[in-house]
């Protein structure tokens, strides 16, 4: 039994290959150091950064988390001018870990968590990268934006006391 997402993603990388025949490796030995480094940045400043921003209880904490979040997104935008993915030109675990936050960003984090400096669609390279990941075989079939929005907007009554789930925004998917 495990509910730690960083460990679960590693298990799914190879633990069931003998059953599925899938040989995809999103954590290749030669790239592990780079993947681990980018995972640290992405987790602390983006994946968890949206929560630090959204659940901040002081103006200072909000502004600090907000600034770090968008500085890191700006860095990712620059990185993606040089490569198609976070670690070179192959999709790795680092990309899938970032995907989960990016796919929710414009619909949830931008308004609900007040991460409202820029939308992901305002970052041309990140937006193209997100579309590319979304179109990987089997991925779009797992994204249910109505479920995502309902979860966030209806469950965080401290942030959204009415529980109203917004109709928008219009997204590419």
Q: Where are each of the predicted segments found?
A:
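C-terminal alpha-helical interaction module
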Residues: 1-173
């Amino acid at each position: 039994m495990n509910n730690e997402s960083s460990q679960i993603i590693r298990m799914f990388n190879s633990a069931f290959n003998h059953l599925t025949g899938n040989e995809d490796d999103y954590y290749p030995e030669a790239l592990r150091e780079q993947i681990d480094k980018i995972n640290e940045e992405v987790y602390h400043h983006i994946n968890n950064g949206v929560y630090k921003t959204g659940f901040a209880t002081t103006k200072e904490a909000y502004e600090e988390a907000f600034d770090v979040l968008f500085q890191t997104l700006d860095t990712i935008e620059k990185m993606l001018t040089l490569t198609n993915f976070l670690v070179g030109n192959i999709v790795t675990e680092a990309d899938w870990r970032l995907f989960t936050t990016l796919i929710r960003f414009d619909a949830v984090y931008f308004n609900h968590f007040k991460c409202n400096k820029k939308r992901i669609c305002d970052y041309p390279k990140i937006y193209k990268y997100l579309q590319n990941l979304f179109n990987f075989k089997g991925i779009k079939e797992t994204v249910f934006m109505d479920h995502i929005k309902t979860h966030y907007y209806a469950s965080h009554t401290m942030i959204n006391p009415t529980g109203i789930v917004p109709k928008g925004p219009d997204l590419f998917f």
